[in-house]
Amino acid sequence: MRHPLRSLAAAGALAFGLAAAPALAGEQYVDETGYAVSGYDVVAYRGLDQAPVGAPQPRAVPGRAEFTTEWNGARWAFASAENLAAFEADPARYAPAYDGHCAYGVGKGGKVPGNPNLWRIVDGVLYLNINPAVVSFWEEDVAGWIESAEGEWP
């Protein structure tokens, strides 16, 4: 049996949570792998040939356990010692926007994980999204969604 008051309370809690989303920034998102960006090498994205909007991106490059560092409350993995050194020299340059959360989700006022294989670099910043359907929405107006996300993120 459905309970209208519970549904109303849940909707209110969701609305309150989305309204409070800007306060959600903090440490880097870490999933069940125990690594930021699911253990993929964030420096390696710069060496991949970025696909045009509407086309799938090349697969992210997995990091290796022997090339890791800690930053922003998370463990980061890299494919090589050179990429590890580049990250350690300037982690903010390579870390994904919104602590690794989905750029479209942040633009909508939420906070959901980003998928390392659904990426785009815009003006030198790495953005992740959660699933292919979201990527298609986000790519309809990349600049507009980035502007929305920046307004939601502290």
Language-model regions, residue ranges each:
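Bacterial N-terminal signal peptides that target proteins for export
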Residues: M1-A10
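N-terminal leader/assembly segments
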Residues: H3, A20-A25
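Bacterial N-terminal signal peptides
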Residues: A9-A19
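Charged, low-complexity intrinsically disordered segments
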Residues: A23-P154
